[in-house]
């Protein structure tokens, strides 16, 4: 799995490659989803963390962003979620967009056809700017209004047509 450095920045994007990377990944998520946004009470970890690909954005030794992705089926449907960027990195590094692009590219490299995500309503324009499309209606998810969104991945063709993903795409 490759690493990437967005032009003009010292931000490194990579799949978590060590126990320290994974610990930092979980710490960023905890800081954002438990401490800052209070979406979860004690932890945001769940069963998907066992098989997920954990991605980090780092400035030198400091991990400032995290996202996880995981395969939902053998035909190439992937889920991206738990995108978290520390507040200072949101403003000064604008780490969110490179982190999302890296996650999408990684799922594509792993044979993905389509990635879906539940996006907080306030972040929908950001994801649309990155090429994601709305799927279905707004709905509550972990106590906040979210929009299901999807993006095509550049890798393997789907073993099923998009209508085979009706359950995931809200159609």
Predicted features and spans:
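Short amphipathic alpha-helix that is part of the acyltransferase structural core
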Residues: 1-54, 58-62, 158-165, 170-171
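Short acidic/glycine-enriched loop/turn segments that link adjacent beta-strands
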Residues: 49-51, 74-76, 141-146
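Conserved beta-strand in the GNAT
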Residues: 56, 61-71, 77-84
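Short, well-ordered beta-strand micro-motif
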Residues: 56-58, 148-152
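Conserved acetyl-CoA-binding loop-helix of GNAT-fold acetyltransferases
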Residues: 85, 91-105
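Conserved short alpha-helix immediately C-terminal to the canonical SAM/SAH-binding motif I
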Residues: 99, 123-126
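Conserved GNAT acetyl-CoA-binding A-motif
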Residues: 106-120
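Conserved catalytic-core motifs of GNAT/GCN5-like acyltransferases
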Residues: 118, 133-150
